């Protein structure tokens, strides 16, 4: 029986943080280890260039860092094909054909793109590559005939745009060579988008409000001890608020089942008064370190031989290119432009 295909990836614009870990990485490793799927995981460097065109050095440096993060959390190149987007030229050619099937107005209506354009402050100077990146994503997904694409809830419009392109292509060229994907969305809404340590709605590289998978133990400790809690909880005996308190928010996400009774007791104690922020932060630190310590150890080990890390990426890219080339050939045959 053929295994369903999963495609997922990240933009290499810096090291990955806890938001990436709970939002996608942890689930990828789970899906990989279930051994029920064929996994493709990629570093979307071309997409990163759509809004970092003048920062190619950052992207180049981030390729190695993100690859280390992948390996350290448990993604295994023997079980998952890990590749670099720019090393698969077939993706750019597929994008070109798909762009002929999507109007500019449709791209401008994409809610995810509209939100991101506003956040990035492009104004009237929107890079054309950024505006059409949903088409590039469709090429990424369809090149590997992905059945399932794990994404955050904010990416639902991107999946729907890909599905539209697939339907349009298959209808226009009387074929079924492209597969219509389904999105896999986070069950835990809190984990789907981890807030920053400062209480900001999202943990973000640009805001510097995150804990990175590569942070050493001392850095993690300092960051946890500086976390946003309840600004009105000045004295230990003061009643404290749970809502909006990042320490308790993180505890809800990272705690295991066996921790739940302790956490509920801490919440009650905190709200009544008599429990200080230092104690709750130390408790959270222990829980985070339980998760981060083995990741950190593996990362340090892999970092000793970056040549091997890049050999893994090269092999994965070669493997991925073979698959993408087959899809491209089918697409061109359907269009009647496979001349030779």
UniProtKB/Swiss-Prot annotation:
What Gene3D superfamilies does the record point to?
HUPs (3.40.50.620), Tyrosyl-Transfer RNA Synthetase (1.10.240.10)
Q: Which molecular-function annotations from GO does this UniProt entry contain?
A: ATP binding; tryptophan-tRNA ligase activity
Pfam families given for it? tRNA-synt_1b
Q: What is its EC number?
A: 6.1.1.2
Grouped into one coarse class, the protein's main location is cytoplasm
Q: Where in the cell is it found?
A: Cytoplasm
A GO cellular component annotation in the UniProt record: cytosol
Q: What does this protein do?
A: Catalyzes the attachment of tryptophan to tRNA(Trp).
How is the quaternary structure described? Homodimer.
* Protein's recorded name: Tryptophan--tRNA ligase
What species is this protein from?
Streptococcus pyogenes serotype M1
Its ancestry begins with: Bacteria, Bacillati, Bacillota, Bacilli, Lactobacillales
